[in-house]
């Protein structure tokens, strides 16, 4: 609701749900996003030892329950860096893109491995790629880049 007050354009929300944590929140977060955001991108957020595709499926069910239409009003993009770039590509100049969930955190857990990750750096890298900036930071590595 606060984001809606910041723009006359669309609100594009990007977020995931951590593995082995708050399973009951997954559907709820996607339901709320389907109701309040214009577009939603579901992605990785510390899946740990859970299947990322299963986490995203649970979230997608919540979006669908509230009228979300896959590949029209919401998308699943496993790689968080590519998800950020995709959200930027969806945006028009007057839209707002919210990259939610990781905040100040400095890593992302896949399996039992913590990979260095910073949403701020990843967003700068995605913006650099989107805008064709030569000296933009490199996108941090995640194992989902290998798919």
Regions found by a protein language model. Give the residues of each.
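ATP-dependent carboxylate-amine ligase
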Residues: 1-147
């Amino acid at each position: 609701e606060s984001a809606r007050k910041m723009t006359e354009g669309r609100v594009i929300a990007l977020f995931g749900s951590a593995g082995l944590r708050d399973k009951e929140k997954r559907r709820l977060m996607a339901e709320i996003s389907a109701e309040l955001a214009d577009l939603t991108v579901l992605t990785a957020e510390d899946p740990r030892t859970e299947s990322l595709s299963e986490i995203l499926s649970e979230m997608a069910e919540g979006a669908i329950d509230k009228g979300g239409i896959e590949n029209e009003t919401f998308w699943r993009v496993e790689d968080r860096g590519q998800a950020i770039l995709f959200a930027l590509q969806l945006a028009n100049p007057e839209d707002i893109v919210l990259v939610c969930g990781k905040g100040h955190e400095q890593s992302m857990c896949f399996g039992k491995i913590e990979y260095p990750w910073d949403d701020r750096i990843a967003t700068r890298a995605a913006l650099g790629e989107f805008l064709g900036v030569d000296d933009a930071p490199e996108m941090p590595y995640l194992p989902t880049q290998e798919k």
